[in-house]
């Protein structure tokens, strides 16, 4: 049976620096949406489309901006950014188990590996020769940490994460189950139709405060390291090929695929299913919408898309048929433009006479 986490509203207000409008002693035992929250839960209004649920919400208190709070008769925590405040408070109610320091008896740790005494190594984990595990790191069951790999302080690896050899991970990095970091890049040379493997002798370097989702793969570099900057957030099932570079605080949604040696700038956002060809660059502050195929470098900040938007199937079939006729339509248009130009030129000559 789970124990109940409980804070007073005053404690929560102090945690996020909120203006409290209501009873500071009100007990709060969780977070919930405006529609689902009860009297012992805190909710928030961050998206205007949910404002319609505010008057009827049963939440014990609501995180609101000053503008929304002025028209609200209930208990509120007034903040500049309700969503950011919610993000901060969510950690107070997080029930993720905290592993105790120490090495499980079934774990296999090389004699020359370094594991900080405050780190936790789970059941059947393997830590190979020369690896270094920093202070407060939590390594889940069945993880493999390859030779000479380094995990910075405060890192958290869910069960069954695999780090190959010579992977360097910064501080406070979270990696979800099934992720594989440092696998061999897809590199081959062709000799008369036969593929000859190229040894991938680079590594992977990951900065601080990075999050890597379940079943995401980051390949090691062919020569130099694949580089992931500070604060990068990677969703589940992302594929990052060898020698890719990702700038600080860039975020990617699920199923993004990035080909080798592509370089992505800082503060970019790639929505789900985006694909990048290799050896191109994306500048800072670029947003790429879902399922876009990026085939050339992007040199100006902004939002980019490719493909066609969803439409009813019957209309899409008509559009697809018209696409097949574009070449013929373009030729006919050129012919009409030439005839129009000839008629216009003839008319001008007649008026001059």
Curated annotation (Swiss-Prot):
The gene is lpxD. Pathway: Bacterial outer membrane biogenesis; LPS lipid A biosynthesis. Homotrimer. It comes from Pseudomonas aeruginosa (strain UCBPP-PA14). This is UDP-3-O-acylglucosamine N-acyltransferase. Keywords: Acyltransferase, Lipid A biosynthesis, Lipid biosynthesis, Lipid metabolism, Repeat, Transferase. Catalyzes the N-acylation of UDP-3-O-acylglucosamine using 3-hydroxyacyl-ACP as the acyl donor. Is involved in the biosynthesis of lipid A, a phosphorylated glycolipid that anchors the lipopolysaccharide to the outer membrane of the cell. One of its GO terms (molecular function) is N-acyltransferase activity. GO terms for biological process: lipid A biosynthetic process. InterPro entries: Hexapep, Hexapep_transf_CS, LpxD, Trimer_LpxA-like_sf, UDP_GlcNAc_AcTrfase_non-rep. GO terms for cellular component: membrane. It catalyses: a UDP-3-O-[(3R)-3-hydroxyacyl]-alpha-D-glucosamine + a (3R)-hydroxyacyl-[ACP] = a UDP-2-N,3-O-bis[(3R)-3-hydroxyacyl]-alpha-D-glucosamine + holo-[ACP] + H(+). PANTHER family: UDP-3-O-ACYLGLUCOSAMINE N-ACYLTRANSFERASE, UDP-3-O-ACYLGLUCOSAMINE N-ACYLTRANSFERASE 1, MITOCHONDRIAL-RELATED. Disulfide bonds: none annotated. The keyword Calcium does not apply.
């Amino acid at each position: 049976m789970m124990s109940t986490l409980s804070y007073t509203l005053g404690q929560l207000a102090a945690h996020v620096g909120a203006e409290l409008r209501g009873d500071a002693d009100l007990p709060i035992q969780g977070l919930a949406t405006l529609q689902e929250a009860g009297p012992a839960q805190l909710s928030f209004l961050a998206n205007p489309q949910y404002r319609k649920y505010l008057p009827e919400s049963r939440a014990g208190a609501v995180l609101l901006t000053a503008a929304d709070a002025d028209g609200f008769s209930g208990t509120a925590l007034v903040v500049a950014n309700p969503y950011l405040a919610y993000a901060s408070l969510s950690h107070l109610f997080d029930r993720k188990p905290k592993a105790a320091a120490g090495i499980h008896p079934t774990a296999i740790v090389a004699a020359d590996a370094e594991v900080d005494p405050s780190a936790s190594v789970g059941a059947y984990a393997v830590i190979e020769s020369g690896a270094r595990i920093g202070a407060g790191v939590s390594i889940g069951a069945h993880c493999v940490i390859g030779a000479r790999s380094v995990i910075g302080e405060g890192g958290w690896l869910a069960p069954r994460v695999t780090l190959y050899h010579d992977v360097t991970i910064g501080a406070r990095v979270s990696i979800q189950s099934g992720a594989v970091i440092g696998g061999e890049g897809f590199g081959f040379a062709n000799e008369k139709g036969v593929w000859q493997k190229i040894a991938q002798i680079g590594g992977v370097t990951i900065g601080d405060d990075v999050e890597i989702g379940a079943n995401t793969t980051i390949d090691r570099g062919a020569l130099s390291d694949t580089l992931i900057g500070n604060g990068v957030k990677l969703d589940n099932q992302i594929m990052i090929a060898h020698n890719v570079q990702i700038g600080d605080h860039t975020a990617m949604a699920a199923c993004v695929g990035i080909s080798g040696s592509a370089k992505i700038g800082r503060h970019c956002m790639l929505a789900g299913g985006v694909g990048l060809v290799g050896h191109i660059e994306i500048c800072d502050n670029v947003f790429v919408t879902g399922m876009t195929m990026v085939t050339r470098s992007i040199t100006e900040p902004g939002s980019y898309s490719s493909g066609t938007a969803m439409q009813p199937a019957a209309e899409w079939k008509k559009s697809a048929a018209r696409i097949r006729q574009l070449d013929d339509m373009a030729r006919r248009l050129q012919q009409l433009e030439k005839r129009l130009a000839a008629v216009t030129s003839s008319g001008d000559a007649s008026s001059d006479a």
